[in-house]
Amino acid sequence: MALGDLMVSRLSQSSVTVVTNHLYDDDDNCASSAHDDSRVSIIASPRVASSSYENLSAATSMAYLPQTLVLCDLRHDDASDIVQPPRWRLKERMKTGCVALVMCLHITVDPPDVIKISPCARLECWIDPFSMFPPRRALEAIGQNLSIQYERWLARARYKVELDPTKDDVRKLCLSCRKYAKTERVLFHYNGHGVPKPTPNGEIWVYNKNFTQYIPLPVSELDSWLKTPTIYVFDCSAARVILNAFAEGESSGPPKDCILLAACDVHETLPQSVEFPADVFTSCLTTPINIALKWFCRRSLLKEFIDESLIDRIPGRQNDRKTLLGELNWIFTAVTDTIAWNVLPRELFQRLFRQDLLVASLFRNFLLAERIMRSGNCTPISHPMLPPTHQHHMWDAWDMAAEICLSQLPQFFLDPNTEFQPSSFFTEQLTAFEVWLDHGSEHKKPPEQLPIVLQVLLSQCHRYRALVLLGRFLDMGPWAVDLALSVGIYPCVVKLLQTTTIELRQILVFIWTKILALDKSCQVDLVKDRGHIYFIRFLDSSDAFPEQRAMAAFILAVIVDGYKRGQESCLEANLIAVCLGHLEATQLCDPPPEPLFLQWLCLCLGKLWEDYLEAQIMGREANASENLIAGHTNLLQVRAAAVFALGTLLDVGFDSGKGVCDEEFDDDENIVEDIIIKSLLDVVSDGSPLVRTEVAVALARFAFGHKQHLKSVADSYWKPQNSLRTSLPSMAKFHDSGTSIVASSDMGSLTRASPDSQPVAREGRISSSLQEPFSGLMQGSPLADDSSLHSDVGIIHDGVSNGVVHQPRPLDNAIYSQSVLAMFTLAKDPSPRIASLGRRVLSVIGIEQIVAKPSKSNGRPGEAASASHTPLAGLVRSSSWFDMHTGHLPLTFRTPPVSPPQTSYLTGLRRVCSLELRPHLLGSPDSGLADPILGVSGSERSLLPQSTIYNWSCGHFSKPLLGGADANEEIAAQREEKKKFSLEHIAKCQHSSISGLSNIPIANWDTKFETGTKTALLHPFSPIVVAADENERIRVWNYEEATLLNGFDNNDFPDKGISNLCLVNELDDSLLLVASCNVPTLSRASFAIRIWKDYATKGRQKLVTGFSSIQGQKPGASGLNAVVDWQQQSGYLYVSGESLSIMVWDLDKEQLVKSMPFESGCSVTALSASQVHGSQLAAGFADGSVRLYDVRTPDFLVCATRPHQRVEKVVGLSFQPGLDPAKIVSASQAGDIQFLDLRRPKETYLTIDAHRGSLTALGVHRHAPIIASGSAKQLIKVFSLKGEQLGIIKYHTSFMGQQIGPVSCLAFHPYQMLLAAGAAGSFVSLYTHHNTQLPR
């Protein structure tokens, strides 16, 4: 497809006319153009298009201001909230095992300190003690009734009643209760209505045997008999005195688990009003619904219509929510729980309302007692002390529910068939909760209805709505999950996994996802209750959406994460087959499956067989590796998860206590392991740090199991020169073997195995030899020549001599060589974390690295500091494999080389800079680690680096999943403000009349760069200029305030070399892209891309991502002229240099998506990506040619021409301002600037002879008709697009008019008439226009 055809849809709405690219009818000319070395080579070109614009429409603004955003996912946000450890779990659950009821009533005899009114309260446990004769009968009935009232709250406890006891009776009762309860709680209930009030010392009263005396009982004795844990209920006057006595006892000793409930304060007596029962406190604690309704009825307008006796006959059962009595109890529980939740500290709420069922019931009822008894001038007291709750507004909701209930009572008894009408209480409270969800947040008061939501979950009628609302709440963040778990939803959602209701499955999976994202310890409960079966069935269901099945896979991954019982249970439930079945099915899906689902299938498998040999064997037998390799997609999360699963499929060695010969691995398993390592090596240079991290972790596992032989392979390169000559290929041989272009993504092309090469056995395993060695894998390998056989024999003998006795298990030498090369590649990774991991992997096989301090550069790129003198200085390794592939990587071998070189041999031999290999003796103090050839040990295994993909992926489910649009409103508003600013200034730039730039800079910045400014850029929306020097020092300067905002080093490697700076996502929180080209070593250079956030804030810069961008280079490439440009509209980064292609990186996918080859012996020296036409790119070459590419066309190349007369490299290249897709400005080092219309490329339509040679920089304004060129002869010239010279800049504004240095870089502000110029000196100058006249 031609260029014009591809651009029609994009530009059809603008004033630019675009037609198909058929300028020539001469097919021969067109056909031969691609290989023509003449001045002009054309593939296609459209007719001339108009480039006049009257205004910027909304459509054209889309081209000028692309909406594409990259690198803004969770993986790039290191500033995620630190999740605090969950606090919801109780330290321990308690149970009340025994209840002691002590009744001191002595009916018919009033205590001496009580003066009763008439009439007065008489009922005890709703029985009139004077209604029976003899009094003992009434006493027994009251005791029995109290026991029954308590049994409604806790039926399984043991109840013991003592009626009018003596002190010895109480002692025996207490001792027997403690003996029975053991470590469980004991409840001691004391009714002292028939004895005097407690003494000031806190003594309660009992009787002597003849009831002739009151005997004091100190609470200290009571406490010594009952011990702890206990709960006391004192229903007597002045009961707080007893609490004070307990408090004094606790203050003198360690704190005890002791809870006390007292009926009234120190100077208060129990109410005697006839509207209350005599034991009003006990009635509130044990029969709350009855007394609450009677108390409310007397204060309600319904009292004239309701017979109070009907309350005693309310139909239904207390534990049946579908009856009137059951619903009232349900509402009462919800109300009191809500009051407690909203007024108590969380820890106290959990202790009193969630730790013990009986204690929770008593404290709910205690809140009612406070409300009712305060109306009788009594204040119930508790320990721990509770704040006042009698006026809480939730009591109004209870009163309303009670009133609705009472209003129905007469009809129930008039017509027994009357249908029960449920209360609207829960519906209304759920609506209130929903309103909070619409407007609440973490920073507002928590929803008070949360305990009510828990209560609703217990019943089917509102369960679905409650679960949906609960899911919305949990989605607000980990704080919400912790809050919900603290209120007590956990047992309920565990129990709901036993339901088979289909409509609840999806929301339950969502809720469990949120719970496990906060607290993985729930895995134990899920396995114990067989909850994993529920989620495996859901995962295997066909009616669930992929996103929901991804959540199920996440839940199962958490269940098996580090929990052996979970792994065993899921393996028994056939989880491997379920996951692999989905992976197989997704390979045939069109459209592609949900990436999150694929990601968590891989992570679930990886966690299932991590350090679990039985699962690893089953995974290998099921060909899991093939499915995982096929799962490598364009999405980096899936790639990283697949690499993680492949890595954990590798067995790292034996568990402690297992012998060397416990297990055998057959040839098929060897082949699987071989396939896994090859697939890992294929992605060792992946564009995503997340993927490369997993590769490093997986290689560490592989190295741990094969460290003896990996170390031997590395040692083979540490031989004296006479050994190297026989075991290493020459440099010429290496380059002649077809490896002149090194493709790191295909590690197989790096080395070659001889057909006769001997396989090396894996450490610690016994297996038969592989009869057919792998071939075609190692090209240029040090073991690939005729001496490879001898080298292998030496390796095997070395293994035996070091005490590892085993029969050889075949593993191709190529794998070991490629793996060691991959480890060195990772140790030089642009990401500091991955480089550190790479060094740790090397340490596993016995190689330590010495961090070399970079020496001060003298300003001449390519010079490296000489290494410090060592005993091995001068060893010849010019043809060493390390030199060819590792670059300047300081190393140390932690074990001696195979053949230590002699001192005489080392004299006078050449050294390789920055690379130090130092032999360490076994067990030497500075070796740092145990020798890797020793047996597998826990201490060594603990050194293996840990994966990050799993924990990082779990963070996804901690974030809001159901919405989040509101959170982006502020970002959208800022973007719109920037967009408006941009469009206004674009219009000004396009329609301005520019007379030139002032020779006097508006700002002069001394960067203090020792090597001069290499590149600079101007921030589009802030008065900021960013500059960098050859040593990759980056500095950010505010030119309005003349202040340095930040300065940092791009990397810590000794080899430096900056190439370019670009801004990514400039309409949002922009990122700084830094392209650096390190000094090469013999065969390859490192061209690294690093992208920084918060680069303008001092000390806050953070590396978002980093990768090596050039995947292949020419033989002998210096790598110093690598070029890069960024295209926001497509999200593509274009990179080239001394290679045979232009690399196209998708930054959002962090993946190399295309490689555009060019048939030329010249290197690319300039790149310019169109900022208004996505996927379009112009490239300038070292021979002066210019080519136009479009990544959407099959052949990429659209047009090629050679506009410059002299064969000099293209220094600068840019598309002209505006929407025209074919007009380009090209500047040659010879000094001429050519204006091209690539639709008519036979000749340039305008030429400017700007400089007589030595043109060094070109700047083209993105929107204004102005360009600037710089020269090594210390001047800058400014031109219009018509070729008119608008000005010359020669001098800095300073005393004596100091001349500027040789110009190294020029950068225009994208939306203002502002030019930044950097020179070989340390100054960066900013120039603006004389005046701008807008058209009227």
Curated annotation (Swiss-Prot):
InterPro entries attached to this UniProt entry: ARM-like (IPR011989), ARM-type_fold (IPR016024), Raptor (IPR004083), Raptor_N (IPR029347), WD40/YVTN_repeat-like_dom_sf (IPR015943), WD40_repeat_dom_sf (IPR036322), WD40_rpt (IPR001680)
WD repeats: 1008-1047, 1053-1102, 1116-1155, 1159-1199, 1205-1246, 1250-1289, 1298-1336
GO terms of biological process kind: maintenance of shoot apical meristem identity; TOR signaling
UniProt entry keywords in alphabetical sequence: Repeat, WD repeat
A GO CC term attached to the entry: TORC1 complex
Tissue expression as described in the entry: Expressed at low levels in roots, leaves, flowers and seeds.
Stretch list, region Disordered: 746-766
Chain intervals with Polar residues compositional bias: 746-757
Phenotypic effect of disruption: No visible phenotype under normal growth condition.
Family under the similarity heading: Belongs to the WD repeat RAPTOR family.
Main function: Probable component of the plant TOR kinase pathway.
Name of the protein this chain belongs to: Regulatory-associated protein of TOR 2
Organism: Arabidopsis thaliana (Mouse-ear cress)
Taxonomic lineage of the native organism: Eukaryota, Viridiplantae, Streptophyta, Embryophyta, Tracheophyta
Gene name, Swiss-Prot/TrEMBL: RAPTOR2
